[in-house]
Amino acid sequence: MITVRVPATSANMGPGFDTLGIALNLYNDFGFREIEDGLKFNGMPEEFCNEDNIIYKAMKYCFDKAGYKIKGLEISEIKQDVPVSRGLGSSSTCIVGGLVGANEILGKKFSEEELLEMAVEIEGHPDNVAPALLGGMVVAIFDENKTYYDKIDVKNGIKFISIIPNFRLSTEEARKVLPKEISLKDGVYNVSRAALMVACFSSGKYELLRYACKDAFHQNYRSKLIPGFEEVYNKSYELGALACYLSGAGPTIMAIIDEKDERFSNKLKEFLQIKGLEWNILGLSLDNAGATIIEGTK
């Protein structure tokens, strides 16, 4: 069996809407095997055991690109630690996992760049799939039907705290509340802060993240779909967070804190309990590897 491990991702980082994303050390593992015929699923709810399965669709996309007719396919979800519809890239783990698994079956026919192009074609934007495939913090754009990206050498000194609500928020639902157009003022607001944010991660001047992480494109609109958002967001800053932003389409709030801060998570847990919010807190770090093969036998 071919086993692929894919990291969670936090996209739409601050002002970097559809552009900035980071891979984190929380993983989904998928197993793949070519079989004599048919389509077999293991470890998944019955509703996903069909040809509409996003993992299968990504694999078929890759096989079709190669002109390969697969006899049969067995797909297993071995481990699912990335929560679904929480803004941590669960769908991207499926897309990237399927593409990487298919490429292994094909004998690594496609390059990493070609797999990224396929992932963006499927997903529609690069900010989740790029770090899921490549690891690290990635700045990516889509221009004239091609993806261009670069990885940021993130300086040490920080850790990421995922503050995960106990309810789902679909990307489709979160997209509906966004405005069709933005003002020049908001455009300048985000562009300037996105530039500063990249500089902060590159230089390690994390004291500036608080100002760089602000957004005018999506957070104000989507936060209204998340009961308790404002309270938790403001409390995170009060407790010493260097930066806070809505992860992906939400509902997870991502706090960036000093790596030496030992009190933030416990203090925030106390606050959530007082407020009656049954949210989960996960301390995470940067994953630089991206999607990896942890077992490679067909």
From Swiss-Prot:
GO terms of biological process kind: threonine biosynthetic process
Pathway membership: Amino-acid biosynthesis; L-threonine biosynthesis; L-threonine from L-aspartate: step 4/5
Gene3D superfamilies given in the database record: 3.30.230.10, GHMP kinase, C-terminal domain
Keyword tags: Amino-acid biosynthesis, ATP-binding, Cytoplasm, Kinase, Nucleotide-binding, Threonine biosynthesis, Transferase
Binding site for ATP: 83-93
A molecular function (GO) term: ATP binding
One Gene Ontology term, aspect cellular component: cytoplasm
EC nos: 2.7.1.39
InterPro entries xref list: GHMP_kinase_C_dom, GHMP_kinase_C_sf, GHMP_kinase_N_dom, GHMP_knse_ATP-bd_CS, Homoserine_kinase, Ribosomal_Su5_D2-typ_SF, Ribsml_uS5_D2-typ_fold_subgr
Reaction(s) catalysed (UniProt annotation): L-homoserine + ATP = O-phospho-L-homoserine + ADP + H(+)
Entry superkingdom: Bacteria
Keyword Transferase part of the UniProt annotation: yes
Compartment(s) of residence: Cytoplasm
Entry similarity comment: Belongs to the GHMP kinase family. Homoserine kinase subfamily.
Job of this protein: Catalyzes the ATP-dependent phosphorylation of L-homoserine to L-homoserine phosphate.
Protein name, entry field: Homoserine kinase
UniProt source species: Clostridium beijerinckii (strain ATCC 51743 / NCIMB 8052)
Gene: thrB
